Amino acid sequence: MSQSPIELKGSSFTLSVVHLHDSRPEVIRQALQEKVDQAPAFLKNAPVVINVATLPNGANWKDLQQAVTSAGLRIVGISGCQDERQKRAIARAGLPLLSEGKGQKLAPEPVISPPENVPTQTRIINTPVRSGQQIYARNCDLIVISSVSAGAELIADGNIHIYGMMRGRALAGASGDAKCQIFCTHLGAELVSIAGQYWLSDQIPLEYFGQAARLYLQDNTLTIQPLN
């Protein structure tokens, strides 16, 4: 029997969500363009979800869609839409509406305690990470014992440790673990992210640039402190 030409599988991806708080298309376009210009390697042509929960009913979706795409972002879905007329306009644009409603509650699966004295897997990179490279540590921590160039990307489901100059992007807790942290001996990143909460380079406090720093989430907000 021949193999099927296609196969459908469930998967998950880390996507940025753009929350629109203003219905003026030009204001939105300019604000997004500034963000894209700050981190073009990360945001140019990036897939995003647009959250329209705070937009007034009757906002011109066609113009807002054009404003977002003109800034260089690629819309993959819309969330937070409650207005029926807006929903119809979004559907006519050929974009999917993403539901954020509460699903049916399932009985929790029994928790199985992991065996004791089993070491946690860690991915270790001993060489420089060049521009354009992406390193992904699935279900584990990532340690880089070298420099990370601008345009390079580190992704880990666990913590990220960089023992060198960090000029690229670091995304810890990629699977959603808000307890993950980023440790860096020389911070100069284009972007840092933990469980989807991120800072672009201009949001990192200036006094920490080039310094040893630890980043973590506190009350779902990125927090930074010196790494002693």
From Swiss-Prot:
SUPFAM superfamilies: Cell-division inhibitor MinC, C-terminal domain
Keywords attached to this entry: Cell cycle, Cell division, Septation
Pfam hit, one: MinC_C
Keyword Cell cycle assigned: yes
Signal peptide (from-to): none
GO process annotations (BP): cell morphogenesis; division septum assembly; regulation of cell division; regulation of cell septum assembly
UniProt keyword Ligase present: no
Family: Belongs to the MinC family.
Described function: Cell division inhibitor that blocks the formation of polar Z ring septums. Rapidly oscillates between the poles of the cell to destabilize FtsZ filaments that have formed before they mature into polar Z rings. Prevents FtsZ polymerization.
UniProt subunit comment: Interacts with MinD and FtsZ.
Protein name: Septum site-determining protein MinC
Protein source organism: Yersinia pestis
